[in-house]
Structure formats: structure tokens, C-alpha cells
Amino acid sequence: MVREMSAGGVAVRHKDGDWWMAAIELPRDSNPAKPKSDSESSVSTPLTAKSAKRKTASSRSKPVLCLPKGLVDAGEKALDAALREVREETGITSAPIVKLADIKYVYVRSWGDGERVFKIVSFYLLRYESGRIDDVSDEMRVEVARARWVRLEDAPKLLAYRGEKQMARKALEYVKTHSEL
């Protein structure tokens, strides 16, 4: 079994009296490996649970909404990888607040060798600093159909993977209990 180390971020901002989180939609033709365990345009309109339900009702298939994350490069620290992945996949820069938790799961690669992979993803709560959501390179469009702001309160209902839903809940709990943010 192969081991993979990844890192990702729950990048948040406070705007108009609400907390918002940066999320990405995977391209419709991508087929991400779903975890086997229970432990995973420059102008964009914000997504809420109500608008997502309305939009997906008319779609052929429900979009896969997830948190920005990716492999930790050799010699790179998990936090640095999380900051890099958020920047590459969403177009925004952010600063660390706190490590939320690690998600651990096993999946089978759907490409190449079909190898079983034990994956650990370290997630960090990050605060938006600058940039424009969905301002990503053309090369990233293979991985990201679009990036958008989602109400943090709605995120656990909107995200596709159980572990990422848990990270959104932890982030929401943290911002609600830390008024200094």
C-alpha cells in the first residue's frame, strides 16, 4: 500500500455579516477517487445551500464541491503546501490561523496501477488576505472547474466528502468561538 501526504485549507473571510469559505468545483469529466472509509470566471456569485439546490436541480449531475488540497512536495511543510494549494486552486492568498485536524482514509487509484493508497490530509484554517476568487491559471482548469465563495454555515451541506464536511464544521465552530478574528 502506498502512502500519500496532502494538505489543504479552509480559507475563510468575514464579509457582510457572514463567514465565507473558498471552495472548488471539480470538472464534470473528472472522476476523483472517493474515500473508501468514513474518515474526504473571475467574477463568481457566492453559493448558498438554497442556490446550490436550485442550480443542481436543473443540472445533469451534481457538481462535486470540495476544499482546495493537494500533495505535499518533497521537502515542503504541510502548512506551506496548504497555502500553496489554496492559492493555486482558488486564486486567493491566505494566512494561517490554526491547524484543524488530519483526515485519514484509504482509496484505490482509478488510474494507472489501481494501487491502494493510505492518505493523510492535514487541514488548516486560513484567513483570506488578498486575491480574486477563481483567478486561476489555465493549467489548473484540469483540476478546478471553478472556485467560489460559499457561506461557511452552508458548507457542511454542500461539500461532497464526509471528512471535508467535518473540517468545515470545525472551522465554523472556531470562528464562532474566537471573536478576535
Question: What do the PLM-derived regions correspond to, one by one?
Answer:
Residues 16-18, 28-31, 73-74, 104-106, ...:
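Short, charged/polar surface micro-motifs in flexible loops or helix N-caps
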Residues 91-132:
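Active-site segment of metal-dependent pyrophosphate-handling enzymes
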Residues 125-126, 130, 134-168:
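NUDIX/MutT-family hydrolases
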Residues 170-178:
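C-terminal alpha-helix
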